[in-house]
C-alpha cells in the first residue's frame, strides 16, 4: 500500500507554520454522567498531535462520539470531557470549538478540538459541499482513525479528496503496515483463528481466508457448524444448519490445495449455559443429545497450539470458547499463550479478542493489536477501505 505518511512530511520540514487537520478516533466509552471510563483511544491519538505540534503546525483535531442526530447537537454529544483529557495528556490547553465548519482560529503550536463531527449535516453521507468546506480549513489533512476507515464520510474520505495534502497518521500507518504484512506478504505457514457465535456474521471472512491460509482454526458456535458439516453430533449446541453447505465448501476448498480446517477431537460440554455450569470433557464421538459444547477440549487445544507454534504468521479474531466462565476458558487460554510464545508475526483484533488478551495479560507479546473493530473485519474480508483508498489515490498524484 502506497500512501503519504505524516512522519515523511515532518522529516522534510513540511509542517512548519501549516494548518493541520487530524481526524482521530476518540469515540470512548462514558458513564451516565459523561465521565470517560476507558481512555485507550485518546492516549493512542496523542503521538500524531504531539508530532504535528513539535513540527511547528497549528493543529485541529476532530472525532465522532456516539451516534448523534445530524444538525441537532445535544449535551450528551459533546467532546468536552475528551478535550479535558487530551489537555492533561498533552500538558497544554486544548480549547473545544463549536460550529467550526466555516472557520477556526488556531496558531502554530496550539491545538484545538473541533466538536463532534457527526453533528455536522452531511458528515455521514460524505456530502461534497461539506467536505470542500472542511478541506478549506487546512493545508494538511491527517487520517489517524483506522476504526472509521471502512466508512466514507466527510471527515474520513471527502476531505481527503480536496485538502492540499492528505496523509496517514502514525496509528493508521502502523495498522495498515501490520495488516499488510500479515495478509499481503505473510510468512508461511499462515494460521488464522476465526471464532464467534455465528458463521453468518463471519462467512465472508472465512471464505476470503480459506483462499489464503494454511490452517483455518474455527471456534465457538462457528466450530459447531463445521463439526456438523464434518458429520459429528453437537447435541443442543449453538449452530446454523442452513450454512452447512458453506462450511462443507470451505473444508473442501482448503483440502484441495493441501490446507485444512482442523475439526476438534474433544470438547468441553455442559447441560446449561451458566457461570456455575458443570464442565465435562468428552471425545467428539461421545457428545450427548442434551450437551452444549462451550469450549474445545484439552487434546484439541494442544494440537492447535502446536500448529500455532510452527506458524510464520498468525491472525486472531475471536476466542474459541466461553472464556468468560473459567471452566470453559482453557481452550482460549491455551491458544492465547501459544500465540504469545510463537515466533511468528501475530495480529489480533475484535472486541472479545482484546478482552481475552487483557485477561491473560499477553498484550506485549502480540506483534500488533488492531483497534479497528469493523474496519479490521472488513480488511480481513478483503474489502477496500474507502478512507485508505482515497489516501492511496492522492499519493499517486
UniProtKB/Swiss-Prot annotation:
One Gene Ontology cellular component: cytosol
Gene Ontology biological process: gluconeogenesis; glycolytic process
MF GO annotations: ADP binding; ATP binding; phosphoglycerate kinase activity
Compartments where found: Cytoplasm
EC class of the enzyme, as a word: transferase
Binding-site residues, substrate: 25-27, 41, 64-67, 118, 151
Keyword hit for DNA-binding: no
Pathways per UniProt: Carbohydrate degradation; glycolysis; pyruvate from D-glyceraldehyde 3-phosphate: step 2/5
Enzyme Commission number(s) of this protein: 2.7.2.3
Sequence positions that bind ATP: 202, 324, 350-353
SUPFAM superfamilies the UniProt entry points to: Phosphoglycerate kinase
Subunit-level organization: Monomer.
Protein name as it appears in the record: Phosphoglycerate kinase
Species this protein is from: Janthinobacterium sp. (strain Marseille)
